[in-house]
Amino acid sequence: MLKFDEQKQLDSVNCALALRGRIEEIVDSICAEGYKNICWLGIGGTWASALQAEVHMKEKSAIELFSENAAEYVTTGNKRVGKGTIVILSSVTGSTIEMVEGVKKAQADGAKV
């Protein structure tokens, strides 16, 4: 593989694993408060990742969940997003306009992002 940087990949995984404790705290808090459903929000590559996460979760869990393309959600909305919805997203830059607007809309619709 050209330009493959093994150390960069290892560092990336290790950084993600270092967040596990904090992620578990957040999940425990959400479970204690209760939730209705989970929405994976993405655009482009992060939407593709959201679809993969959705498929994996459906395979292992009965939790109500779905994936939304951020641009479509901003344009058309989704009646399933509201109070009790947990929105999970990832963003490479944190400034993709569709994602920024999608987060604002989800919050306005009553979801926890």
State the predicted function of each range.
Residues 33-113:
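Glycine-rich phosphate-binding loops that contact phosphosugars or nucleotide phosphates
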Residues 1-32:
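Cofactor-/ligand-binding subdomain signature composed of acidic, glycine-rich
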